[in-house]
């Protein structure tokens, strides 16, 4: 698998900031997995500073809150599945830093 270029990182950041899922970002820029799109997003985010970075982190944090709400609602009757997804969500938050 190819390593995303800086340009791919910037595309990932722009697409994610526009509200695309990591899976949709990966498809759009030719990556194999959503986790690769997330890594590209995070690399681009780390190159940002100050107010721009804060704005991007706040927007991503808001998306993750919305995702948690959807997970808790959708998977309420499947506690093991919900717990697995919430653990994955915790990792997304941890990587966001």
PLM feature spans:
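Amphipathic alpha-helical protein-protein interaction segments
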Residues: 60-97
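Short, amphipathic alpha-helical "recognition" segments used to contact nucleic acids or chromatin
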Residues: 3-20
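Short amphipathic alpha-helical surface patches that mediate protein-protein
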Residues: 30-31, 42, 87-90
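Residue-level signal for cytosolic alpha-helical hairpin/rod architecture
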Residues: 9, 22, 65-68
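Short Lys/Arg-enriched helix C-cap and helix-to-coil transition segments
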Residues: 45-63, 67
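DNA major-groove recognition helix of helix-turn-helix
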Residues: 16, 40-41, 45-48
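Short, basic interhelical loop/turn and adjoining N-cap
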Residues: 21-23, 27-40
């Amino acid at each position: 698998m190819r390593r995303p270029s800086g340009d791919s990182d910037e595309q990932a950041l722009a697409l994610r900031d526009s509200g695309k899922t990591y899976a949709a970002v990966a498809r759009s820029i030719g990556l194999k997995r959503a986790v690769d799109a997330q890594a590209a997003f995070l690399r681009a985010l780390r190159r940002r500073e100050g107010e721009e970075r804060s704005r991007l982190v706040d927007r991503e944090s808001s998306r993750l809150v919305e995702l948690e709400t959807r997970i808790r609602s959708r998977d309420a009757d499947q506690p093991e599945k919900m717990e697995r997804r919430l653990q994955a969500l915790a990792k997304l938050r941890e990587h966001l830093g």
